[in-house]
Amino acid sequence: MLSCRFQCALVLLSLAVVFSKVSAAPSDLRLRQLLQRSLAAAAGKQELTKYSLAELLSELAQSENDALDSSDLSRGADQDEVRLELDRSANSSPLAARERKAGCKNFFWKTFTSC
Protein backbone atom coordinates (compact mmCIF):
# COMPACT_ATOMS: atom_id res chain seq x y z
CA MET A 1 0.00 0.00 0.00
CA LEU A 2 2.75 2.35 0.85
CA SER A 3 4.48 1.65 -2.42
CA CYS A 4 1.23 2.25 -4.30
CA ARG A 5 0.82 5.66 -2.66
CA PHE A 6 4.45 6.41 -3.30
CA GLN A 7 4.07 5.45 -6.98
CA CYS A 8 0.93 7.62 -7.31
CA ALA A 9 2.67 10.57 -5.71
CA LEU A 10 5.65 10.09 -8.00
CA VAL A 11 3.38 9.95 -11.07
CA LEU A 12 1.50 13.08 -9.96
CA LEU A 13 4.76 14.87 -9.29
CA SER A 14 6.16 13.95 -12.71
CA LEU A 15 2.91 15.06 -14.39
CA ALA A 16 3.09 18.37 -12.53
CA VAL A 17 6.67 18.86 -13.68
CA VAL A 18 5.77 18.04 -17.29
CA PHE A 19 2.81 20.43 -17.27
CA SER A 20 4.89 23.17 -15.70
CA LYS A 21 7.52 22.78 -18.43
CA VAL A 22 4.85 22.83 -21.10
CA SER A 23 3.25 25.93 -19.63
CA ALA A 24 6.68 27.53 -19.18
CA ALA A 25 7.65 27.02 -22.83
CA PRO A 26 5.26 29.64 -24.21
CA SER A 27 6.40 32.16 -21.61
CA ASP A 28 9.98 31.62 -22.78
CA LEU A 29 8.77 32.23 -26.30
CA ARG A 30 6.90 35.29 -25.10
CA LEU A 31 9.99 36.53 -23.30
CA ARG A 32 12.07 36.03 -26.43
CA GLN A 33 9.50 37.91 -28.51
CA LEU A 34 9.40 40.68 -25.94
CA LEU A 35 13.19 40.86 -25.95
CA GLN A 36 13.29 40.98 -29.75
CA ARG A 37 10.67 43.73 -29.79
CA SER A 38 12.58 45.76 -27.22
CA LEU A 39 15.81 45.33 -29.19
CA ALA A 40 14.04 46.37 -32.38
CA ALA A 41 12.57 49.38 -30.58
CA ALA A 42 16.00 50.28 -29.21
CA ALA A 43 17.47 49.99 -32.70
CA GLY A 44 14.64 52.17 -33.99
CA LYS A 45 15.34 54.74 -31.28
CA GLN A 46 19.03 54.62 -32.13
CA GLU A 47 18.21 55.20 -35.80
CA LEU A 48 15.89 58.00 -34.75
CA THR A 49 18.67 59.48 -32.63
CA LYS A 50 21.08 59.25 -35.55
CA TYR A 51 18.49 60.88 -37.81
CA SER A 52 17.85 63.60 -35.25
CA LEU A 53 21.58 64.18 -34.84
CA ALA A 54 22.08 64.38 -38.60
CA GLU A 55 19.12 66.73 -38.93
CA LEU A 56 20.43 68.90 -36.09
CA LEU A 57 23.90 69.09 -37.63
CA SER A 58 22.51 70.01 -41.03
CA GLU A 59 20.36 72.77 -39.52
CA LEU A 60 23.36 74.04 -37.57
CA ALA A 61 25.52 74.09 -40.70
CA GLN A 62 22.76 75.85 -42.63
CA SER A 63 22.37 78.54 -39.97
CA GLU A 64 26.16 78.95 -39.83
CA ASN A 65 26.28 79.36 -43.61
CA ASP A 66 23.48 81.92 -43.45
CA ALA A 67 25.32 83.83 -40.73
CA LEU A 68 28.54 83.78 -42.74
CA ASP A 69 26.73 84.99 -45.85
CA SER A 70 25.16 87.90 -43.98
CA SER A 71 28.49 88.82 -42.35
CA ASP A 72 30.19 88.64 -45.76
CA LEU A 73 27.62 91.08 -47.11
CA SER A 74 28.15 93.46 -44.21
CA ARG A 75 31.95 93.14 -44.59
CA GLY A 76 31.62 93.90 -48.28
CA ALA A 77 29.63 97.02 -47.47
CA ASP A 78 32.20 98.05 -44.84
CA GLN A 79 35.05 97.50 -47.28
CA ASP A 80 33.27 99.61 -49.90
CA GLU A 81 32.90 102.41 -47.36
CA VAL A 82 36.58 102.17 -46.39
CA ARG A 83 37.64 102.24 -50.03
CA LEU A 84 35.44 105.26 -50.61
CA GLU A 85 37.00 107.04 -47.62
CA LEU A 86 40.50 106.14 -48.81
CA ASP A 87 39.71 107.46 -52.27
CA ARG A 88 38.45 110.70 -50.76
CA SER A 89 41.54 111.12 -48.61
CA ALA A 90 43.86 110.38 -51.53
CA ASN A 91 42.07 112.84 -53.81
CA SER A 92 41.74 115.61 -51.26
CA SER A 93 45.39 116.62 -51.09
CA PRO A 94 45.36 120.42 -50.85
CA LEU A 95 48.84 120.79 -52.24
CA ALA A 96 50.12 119.35 -55.49
CA ALA A 97 53.24 117.18 -55.53
CA ARG A 98 55.39 120.11 -56.70
CA GLU A 99 54.13 122.37 -53.94
CA ARG A 100 55.01 119.95 -51.13
CA LYS A 101 58.28 120.29 -49.35
CA ALA A 102 61.01 117.95 -50.54
CA GLY A 103 61.56 116.38 -47.10
CA CYS A 104 57.94 115.32 -46.76
CA LYS A 105 58.10 112.97 -49.75
CA ASN A 106 61.06 111.01 -48.41
CA PHE A 107 60.51 108.18 -46.01
CA PHE A 108 62.82 105.91 -44.12
CA TRP A 109 61.73 102.46 -42.97
CA LYS A 110 58.00 102.98 -43.24
CA THR A 111 57.97 106.39 -41.59
CA PHE A 112 58.08 109.83 -43.14
CA THR A 113 60.92 112.14 -42.28
CA SER A 114 60.18 115.39 -40.56
CA CYS A 115 59.32 118.27 -42.86
Curated annotation (Swiss-Prot):
<dbReference type="GO" id="GO:0005615">
    <property type="term" value="C:extracellular space"/>
</dbReference>
<protein>
    <recommendedName>
        <fullName>Somatostatin-1</fullName>
    </recommendedName>
</protein>
<dbReference type="GO" id="GO:0030334">
    <property type="term" value="P:regulation of cell migration"/>
</dbReference>
<keyword id="KW-0732">Signal</keyword>
<feature type="compositionally biased region" description="Basic and acidic residues">
    <location>
        <begin position="75"/>
        <end position="88"/>
    </location>
</feature>
<keyword id="KW-0372">Hormone</keyword>
<keyword id="KW-1015">Disulfide bond</keyword>
<keyword id="KW-0964">Secreted</keyword>
<dbReference type="Pfam" id="PF03002">
    <property type="entry name" value="Somatostatin"/>
</dbReference>
<keyword id="KW-0165">Cleavage on pair of basic residues</keyword>
<comment type="similarity">
    <text>Belongs to the somatostatin family.</text>
</comment>
<feature type="signal peptide">
    <location>
        <begin position="1"/>
        <end position="24"/>
    </location>
</feature>
<dbReference type="InterPro" id="IPR004250">
    <property type="entry name" value="Somatostatin"/>
</dbReference>
<dbReference type="GO" id="GO:0005179">
    <property type="term" value="F:hormone activity"/>
</dbReference>
<feature type="region of interest" description="Disordered">
    <location>
        <begin position="65"/>
        <end position="95"/>
    </location>
</feature>
<feature type="disulfide bond">
    <location>
        <begin position="104"/>
        <end position="115"/>
    </location>
</feature>
<feature type="propeptide">
    <location>
        <begin position="25"/>
        <end position="88"/>
    </location>
</feature>
<comment type="function">
    <text>Somatostatin inhibits the release of somatotropin.</text>
</comment>
<dbReference type="InterPro" id="IPR018142">
    <property type="entry name" value="Somatostatin/Cortistatin_C"/>
</dbReference>
